[in-house]
Amino acid sequence: MPDYDIITVGGGLGGASFAKAMAERGARVLVVEREAKFKDRVRGEWLAPWGVAEAHELGVYETLISQCGYHPTGWDTRLAGNSIGLRDLAATTPHAKHPMTFYHPRAQEALVEAAERAGVEVKTGVRVVAVQPGATPSVTLQSNGRSASLTTRLVVGVDGRGSMVRKWGGFDSNDDPDQQWLAGILIENTPAPMDYSVAVFNPFASRIALMFPQGDRRARFYFGARSRSRE
C-alpha cells in the first residue's frame, strides 16, 4: 500500500487548494513545500469574477475573504490618464461576483492552514529532489541533509513555471519568446482609491499601469510594457 494517495509538490495557492479539496473527499494527501515561510514576490493578486466563483466552488472563498481577501467593487479603465468608464464588474459579468484582491503570502498561509484542518499533512522547508514515475510513483524528499523516499498513487506537480516535476515526468514544455515585462510594488498608506481597481493604457507606447487595492490603505501597483518599448 502506498504511503499516500496523493503527494502534491508545491504548497502555494493551487497546491493547497487542491490538497484541501481531495482530503475533504477522503484522500490521504501530503503537501511538500520548499519554502519555510512564504515571501512577497511580484505576482497576480487580483481574482476575476469567474475566479471568485471558482473559489466558492472549491470551498476556499470563506478562507480567503476572512483571512486576507478584499472586494473592490469597480473597475476604472483609463486611456492616457483619462477615464473612459467606471464599471461595476458584479453587475456586468456572467457570474455576478465582485473581483477579489489579496496579499499573496497571507493567502498562501491561509490556504495551507485550511488544508491542514481538512487533514492534509504539510511539510514546509523540504525540497523534492526526485520523482520516479511508474505504477507506484515515488517522491524523494530532502531536509537538513537527510533524504527519504515516499510512495503514492498520484504525484501532482504545482511547483511553478520552472517545474522539476514536469521534467521528471518527461513532459514537454513550449515557451513563447519574451514579449512583455511586468514590474510591481506594494504600497502602504496610499491615497489611491480603495473601492475600485484602475487600469491605465498607453497604446502608443505599448504600456499599461495597474492598481489593485487590498484595503487598509494598501495597494499593489504594476507597470507593464512590451520588451521592445521598455527603454
Which residues make up each language-model segment?
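Active-site-adjacent segment of FAD-dependent monooxygenases/related oxidoreductases
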Residues: 48-110
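N-terminal Rossmann-fold NAD(P) dinucleotide-binding loop
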Residues: 15
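Glycine-rich FAD pyrophosphate-binding loop
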Residues: 23-43
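Core beta-strand elements of the Rossmann-like FAD/NAD(P) dinucleotide-binding domain
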Residues: 2-4, 145-154
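A conserved beta-strand/loop element that lines the FAD pocket in flavoprotein oxidoreductases
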Residues: 116-128
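Beta1/beta-strand and adjacent pyrophosphate-binding region of the FAD-binding site
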Residues: 1-12
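Conserved FAD-binding catalytic core of PHBH/FMO-like flavoproteins
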Residues: 130, 136-140, 146-148, 158-231
